[in-house]
Amino acid sequence: MTLQRTDEVLTFTKEHYIDKTQELKKGIETFPSIFIEGAAESGKTVAVNMLMKEQKDTDFVLFLMDREKDDGSFIRKLSLIRRRMEKEKIWVVCENMNQPLSDAKAEALVEFVKRLADGNRCIFVSREKPHRKILELLWKEKMHLISQKSLLFSIEEIESICKRNSLAVRAKDIFRETGGWPGCVCLLARMFRNKMEAGESATLSEMRNSYEVAGYIDSEILGTLSKRESDFLEIGSWCPWINGKMCEDIWKISDGMETIKNLERKGFLIECGKEQYATAALFRKEACRQNSKRKFWMTVGAWYEAEGFIKEGLFCMTNANEKEALKTFAIRNYAEIPFIDMGFVAAERWKETIPEICFLRGMNCYFSQNIEGMDK
């Protein structure tokens, strides 16, 4: 626990950042506490720092919750702060609430917030969703929940960063690469500006795939995930999409949907269709820790086909690089494949004269406007 004045808050570089305190202000002005939930490097702490910079007559107490191991000691500290609040205006910030919170700590924090008055406030900052007991504050209108989505930068906000720094890169391209993830946007902006000042040039793709940016994503963001979350994210990077049924049918994981929803909540997975989730573009490269195997593609492809998702099945069977398996898949689904892949060139190499393959060859010639080939 540390006591700091507002002028001692960590600094931030305004040239490369956007003020995202509006949502925090809305909550903190109405409720005695706010809970900011977001993955690593999503801008949670910077937003809190920017908010605290504006509180000129307020002291704040910072708890690094991952270091508060003893329940009794933590509860005694809260009691001490409560007594001080009778004479002083203090805001309590509970940072790094990333590990499971004990019931005792959660109950103590709930009671602490319920008794806040006279402008005293409590701010929770976490990579994980609130402890169930903490939710009582939300239900009883004692807490405002701030999601990660409200912290992400929009194309317009990225455009303002680009203009502020005279960056010769389009904001929508940065947004496409980063999804508006604040830490990544700011890092790219700084690196582009450094290149510009040094008289050097680089493309967005080169900067995104640079050692510095790739290492940042892998270490500072993906490195905070559990092994299970990392595994799900990797599968979501290889596959067109994943869902809970796939996890249960193929890998016998009955609670896979819970992990998927948590990853979506953190911004690592995006919902690309009804109950279909894929890894966000920002993380696809680093999330793939090893090359996918033939067996993986065959298994997943068979699942997609059995569920009626022929386009996804074709993608997997093509990646399996198993010619005979692809051919039998195409024969089973000959009526749909030409309209999924109008340039299904694999059919050109098949010499069989069975109706299904003849149809596939003919449709390939039709879509490629090879009229002569249709007679073969």
Where are each of the predicted segments found?
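Conserved P-loop NTPase "ATPase switch" module shared by AAA+ and STAND
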Residues: R83-L109
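Walker A/P-loop nucleotide-binding motif
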Residues: T30-V48
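Conserved adenine-nucleotide phosphate-binding loops and their immediately adjacent elements
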Residues: M1-K26
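Amphipathic alpha-helical "lid/sensor" segments that cap RecA-like P-loop NTPase cores
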Residues: E41, V48, L145, S160-E212, ...
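Extended alpha-helical scaffolding segments used for macromolecular assembly and cargo binding
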Residues: K293-M374
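Short capping/hinge segments at domain boundaries that bridge a core fold to an adjacent linker or tail
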Residues: N194, N209-A214, W238-M246, I250-A302
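Conserved catalytic segments around the Walker B and adjacent sensor/switch elements
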Residues: K56-K69
